[in-house]
């Protein structure tokens, strides 16, 4: 019997500040060209760097697609590797967005937990991707930066009960080009899906014991 296709949503960000071309959206567009194989329905979206749009759009994407996984991709001017973020944070949002706005409460979800961890084992994903021998270095982080990246991640983790991931990429050419970032994203997301399936298989086995 044919397995149902999995829905995977991947987002990148639009321009902001010094990033007139946002490497995250370029990388996501490269991923879209490559695809994630016949068993995955890939849906990609460009997200404006605006808190209020994120608060409206992220829950809508979860509602529309009921995805197996949502992966958000953002650019970090400080990054020199492709970085897997373990968690999103609820408070500390003071930086103004493209609309010169920041939440009055400085938080994502009032009365929400301080932080939410992804249910994906990022250490395992990092190790698996590293063994593939890609020409891109992959590392782990627990601080997505308290700006729109972190805000988006927490919002998605909260709505998706942890079935979300965030990947930070460096600016284009520092040191990776668009093709390298797109291929790295594909490898990372394929490994994330593998780790998720393995974890769910383990849970299913435990329930049957």
From Swiss-Prot:
Any Gene Ontology biological process: protein catabolic process
Catalytic residues identified in the record: 85, 149, 168
Pfam families, A to Z: Peptidase_C15
Entry protein name: Pyroglutamyl-peptidase 1
Catalytic activity: Release of an N-terminal pyroglutamyl group from a polypeptide, the second amino acid generally not being Pro
Recorded GO CC terms: cytosol
Keywords from the named record: Cytoplasm, Hydrolase, Protease, Thiol protease
UniProt cross-references to CDD domains, sorted A to Z: Peptidase_C15
Any GO MF annotation of the entry: peptidase activity
EC number annotated for this UniProt entry: 3.4.19.3
Lineage of producing organism: Eukaryota, Metazoa, Chordata, Craniata, Vertebrata
Entry keyword Secreted: no
Protein function: Removes 5-oxoproline from various penultimate amino acid residues except L-proline.
Quaternary structure note: Monomer.
Compartments (UniProt record): Cytoplasm
UniProt organism field: Rattus norvegicus
Source domain of life: Eukaryota
Enzyme class of the recorded protein, top EC level: hydrolase
Family: Belongs to the peptidase C15 family.
Name of the gene encoding the protein in the UniProt record: Pgpep1
């Amino acid at each position: 019997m044919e397995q149902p296709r999995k829905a995977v949503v991947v987002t990148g960000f639009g321009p902001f500040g010094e990033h007139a071309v946002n490497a995250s959206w370029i990388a996501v567009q490269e991923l879209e060209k490559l695809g994630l194989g016949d068993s995955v329905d890939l849906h990609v979206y460009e997200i404006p760097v605006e808190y209020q749009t994120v608060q409206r759009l992220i829950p809508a994407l979860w509602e529309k697609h009921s995805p197996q996984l949502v992966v958000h991709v953002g650019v970090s001017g400080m990054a020199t590797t492709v970085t897997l973020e373990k968690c999103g944070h609820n408070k500390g949002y003071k930086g103004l967005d493209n609309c010169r706005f920041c939440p009055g409460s400085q938080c994502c979800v009032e009365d929400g937990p301080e932080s939410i961890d992804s249910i994906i084992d990022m250490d395992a994903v990092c190790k698996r991707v590293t063994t593939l021998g890609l020409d891109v270095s992959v590392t782990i982080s627990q601080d997505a930066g308290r700006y729109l990246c972190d805000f988006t991640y927490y919002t998605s983790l909260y709505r998706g009960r942890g079935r979300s991931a965030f990947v930070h990429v460096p600016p284009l050419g520092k040191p990776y080009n668009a093709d390298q970032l797109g291929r790295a994203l594909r490898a990372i997301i394929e490994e994330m899906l593998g780790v998720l399936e393995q974890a769910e298989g383990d849970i299913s086995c435990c329930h049957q014991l």
